[in-house]
């Protein structure tokens, strides 16, 4: 079982963000049975300050299982790698699942891209796989969100790649601060709600990303009968 947290946006002096992540960590740490690992799918820090990552590490410390991270558009990749002492792209086992992370960030931009050529050789292990990236490779119907997403050409290239890798059972993402379900080339795409603020559904083009009072949450991904089942857990 893989637990997924996303988008805590920890900022120095922001007690509410720290408390929200602390609550999420406590909930995951108390799960029985315990997850095999935890994924934090981007925007760990709000400004990319190295001191924010030190705080994130402290807040994640109560988790007794391995914690895996990947960068979001608010993160500084070099600072994140230094804080967690590992590259942001890696392949690792999480119980019966294989977790493959992809860095979709573009320095200085909020949108993303998928480095398909770099990803292709990393998918050769036939173990049931979850592909994790910050930006979700789907169209949400919310114009302000879609403006900060993945280009269609990149999504098409990824779909072509996944057609040759049927062991990729799920794509999981963050970035959107809402739980959503879609698909890319027949592979289900799941977006995790934020551990902090949630974004409102604004289907009309406003140019803004308003928040709302929806509860934060996390996700659990389980391999059952050869397929991945994902659960949304509100906090």
Predicted feature residues:
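Active-site-proximal beta-strand elements of phosphoester/diester hydrolases
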Residues: 1-10, 96-106, 130-133, 187-193, ...
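N-terminal active-site segment of His-dependent metallophosphoesterases
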Residues: 1-59, 140-143
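Residue-level marker of motif borders
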Residues: 2, 38, 67-68, 91, ...
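Divalent metal-coordination and catalytic microenvironments
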Residues: 7, 38, 43, 56, ...
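Active-site environment of divalent metal-dependent phosphoester hydrolases
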Residues: 11-13, 45-51, 73-80, 107-110, ...
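Binuclear metal-dependent phosphoesterase catalytic core
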Residues: 22, 161, 180-235
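His/acidic metal-ligating clusters that form di-metal
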Residues: 26-37, 111-188, 217-220, 228
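Extended active-site neighborhood of metal-dependent phosphoesterases/phosphodiesterases
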Residues: 49-121, 154-157, 163-167, 185, ...
């Amino acid at each position: 079982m893989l637990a997924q947290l996303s988008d805590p946006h920890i900022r120095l002096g922001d007690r509410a963000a720290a408390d929200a992540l602390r609550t999420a960590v406590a909930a995951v740490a108390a799960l029985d049975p315990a997850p095999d690992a935890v994924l934090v799918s981007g925007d760990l820090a709000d400004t990319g300050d190295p001191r924010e990552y030190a705080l994130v590490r402290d807040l994640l410390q109560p988790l007794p299982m391995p914690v895996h991270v990947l960068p979001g558009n608010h993160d500084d990749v070099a600072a994140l790698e230094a804080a967690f002492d590992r590259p942001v792209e890696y392949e690792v086992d999480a119980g019966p699942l294989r977790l493959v992370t992809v860095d979709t960030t573009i320095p200085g931009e909020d949108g993303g891209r998928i480095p398909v050529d770099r990803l292709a050789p990393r998918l050769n292990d036939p173990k049931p796989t979850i592909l994790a990236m910050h930006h979700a490779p789907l169209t949400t119907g919310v114009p302000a969100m879609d403006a900060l997403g993945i280009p269609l050409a990149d999504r098409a290239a990824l779909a072509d790649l996944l057609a040759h890798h049927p062991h990729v059972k799920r794509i999981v993402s963050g970035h959107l601060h809402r739980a959503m379900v879609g698909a890319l080339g027949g592979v289900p795409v799941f977006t995790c709600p934020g551990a902090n603020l949630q974004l409102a559904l604004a289907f009309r083009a406003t140019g803004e990303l308003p928040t709302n009072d929806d509860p934060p949450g996390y996700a659990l991904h389980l391999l059952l009968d050869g397929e991945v089942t994902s659960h949304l857990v509100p906090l």
